[in-house]
Amino acid sequence: MSNIIKQLEQEQLKQNLPSFRPGDTLEVKVWVVEGSKRRLQAFEGVVIAIRNRGLHSAFTLRKVSNGVGVERVFQTHSPIVDSITVKRKGAVRQAKLYYLRERSGKSARIKERLGD
């Protein structure tokens, strides 16, 4: 029984995902339904957490919009997520960057990772 579930989950995994790590700046394009219309909405932010669980993998993006911190959790293999683009690679030494929630301005900056 579990082999059937694993096979079904394997078929639903997205194959064309870029590799990204915490600290990277991503642009995620998501399908949004407004009434009868369907359009793409872009969300650009810094990866502060990644949860690797196969089909149930997720990542959290954080951005500051009009002085307010906005965090959004995306399911990596969701059909709602249209595309993921890496805009900038960040050099950090932690897996979870929750400390960025308390920081603002220059202290919230992340150095760029070079040569990678």
Curated annotation (Swiss-Prot):
SUPFAM superfamilies: Translation proteins SH3-like domain (SSF50104). The keyword Ribosomal protein applies. It comes from the Bacteria. One of its GO terms (cellular component) is cytosolic large ribosomal subunit. This protein is located at the 30S-50S ribosomal subunit interface and may play a role in the structure and function of the aminoacyl-tRNA binding site. Belongs to the bacterial ribosomal protein bL19 family. Keywords: Ribonucleoprotein, Ribosomal protein. The keyword Ribonucleoprotein applies. InterPro entries: Ribosomal_bL19, Ribosomal_bL19_CS, Ribosomal_bL19_sf, Translation_prot_SH3-like_sf. Pfam families: Ribosomal_L19. GO terms for molecular function: structural constituent of ribosome. GO terms for biological process: translation. This is Large ribosomal subunit protein bL19.
